[in-house]
Amino acid sequence: MRKIAFYTLGCKVNQADTASMEGIFRASGYEVVPFGEPADVYLVNTCVVTNTGQRKSRQIINRAVRHNPLSLVVVTGCYPQTAPEEVRAIEGVDVIIGNQERGRIVELVEEALEHKRTEILDNVQQMTVDTKFEELGVGTETDKTRAFLKIQEGCNQYCTYCIIPFARGPLRSRSLESIREEVGKLVAAGYKEVVLIGIHLGCYGKELAKEGKHVTLYDAVKAALSVEGVQRVRLGSLESVEVEPRLLQLMAEEPRLQRHLHLPLQSGCDKILRAMHRPYDTKRFTELVNEIRAQVPDVAITTDVIVGFPGETEEDFATTLEFAKQCGFAKMHIFPYSKRKGTPAAEMPEQVDEAVKSERAARLAKVDEELHQQMLQSTVGKVEEVLFEQSVDDAHMEGLCGPYLRVVVPGTKELANTIAKVKITGIKEDFLLGELN
């Protein structure tokens, strides 16, 4: 039996893609082993959203080549899709494939293994408006409790800092039938929570309108919830302007749809939002957040913020700090701006010094910690349903509640992958303490 090892960098969508490829290889008779163990094939699923992601992708590729000179090295994902010539130039890479036609990954790998080609087997495909969603199955052979199901691919937003539309192509969506089928497989495999994810999740179904199919993210969520036995459904990141009122109503009424929305802000300064080509200003974002909280009062709203975007002054950053406080985010993911070749922002004047970016990120992180503690404090005294995932020690278990907060309770590993009501009794560092109710 041939062995294959995977290494995944980047986002949840990449993780879902890797899980799908693992499933394809297992179905073809391969054994999946940890990346540090001997294998016939090493596959690196890459990331280019930041310079750090791209640099680490190169490091992992080089490590795979250096440590396993007789094995096949396969590179897939956003790096070969956006810079195939760079990946081709890495000595020792045998196969490259972008973000499309990964259903053929075993065929390509076996062709390379059979013939031990002296040149790279290159299958990076250009994506056009006619590119269809690649309905790969989901990998189900893990010991995890939550599964990520990719239901949407591609982005047409073209924010000025972002390379992802070039890496992931145009909008395309998984069919409702496929969503029901894949959620059914996950439920049968024992997963208690399914997280619906995409590159531009709020645009689910948008491109299908030209085929006469009028579906939205609301319909995708309803499809997932319609599967017998599904216990929890959670949404991945989506734009605030794409949150439908009926989706909020569903979240308020349907206990299985978790009370958590990740709404990327990126900046709290209107001047910077315009320069970023974001689809809202701070006034509209505030209105949307208020509407969400009016319909779902106990919702947790998390976000992404970029600091040090070209032209961001100290005054602009101070505006973002104050706006973040006003929004009361449960958690912020903070990113120093990373210049990406080929994007408009990379050519903008007034690039911000790296030291200034780091200093601003640290200041915003302090605000994030304050807001997170406020969110934790507001949960004390409540009863939450917790999906237990792993043991902290021999006497305590850790899990995730609806608002995407970590909860630790006295308990043993028998609680793993079960859902139980927990009375929240206190806070320790950045997580909640509780007792089984």
Residue ranges and their predicted role:
Residues 48-49, 168, 208-212, 274-280, ...:
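Short glycine-enriched, charge-decorated loop/helix-capping segments at active-site entrances
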Residues 142-145, 155-157, 257, 267, ...:
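Short flexible coil/turn linkers enriched for glycine and charged/polar residues
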Residues 347-437:
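Terminal RNA-binding accessory module
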Residues 73-74, 82-83, 188-314:
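Conserved SAM/AdoMet-binding glycine-rich loop
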Residues 103, 157, 169, 202, ...:
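Glycine-centered loop/turn positions within well-structured domains
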Residues 1-204, 216, 246, 257, ...:
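Proteins enriched for Cys/Gly/acidic motifs involved in redox and nucleic-acid/cofactor modification
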Residues 263, 304, 324, 332, ...:
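Hydrophobic, well-ordered secondary-structure elements that form the walls
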Residues 14, 50-53, 80, 240, ...:
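Alpha-helix N-cap/loop-to-helix initiation residues
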